[in-house]
Amino acid sequence: LAYFMTTKQYIPYIRKIVGKEHYVDVKNVMIMGGGATAVRTVKTMPSYMDVKIIETDEQRCERLNALLEDEKALIINGDGRDLSLLVEEGIKNTQAFVALTGNAETNILACLTAKRMGVRKTVAMVENIDYVSMAESLDIGTIINKKSIAAKIGRAHV
């Protein structure tokens, strides 16, 4: 793991030397699921990113609007599994899709769908540890598992 600090003008050079020169800058992000993880994610994103959160629960959408009123996020009440909604909301112009619902299967399938629709970077939250290796084998992108992250942090502090 390596970290680089540079000015904006040298980013293409850094990408070239690490073999990531075709890496896509992420400007448009779509998040499926409006839970606490989504809120923390949006609050830590750079201000130049445009974020859309798709949430099925209307009351949760209202709460998200209140929690994220200072952030550059559009809250959409709908089902992130609805292909026509994804197209209508611009998934084809989205560089990153993040599935953060409480359902691992939904997150995995949503990321597979996003990949097939041309999204280059996908992230799926997979709470069921039994699904992690299967999800990794599907090449859906990044897998987040809170339990394994907590275990790694715990081992690092022992």
Give the role of each language-model region.
Residues L1-V158:
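Cytosolic regulatory regions of ion transport systems
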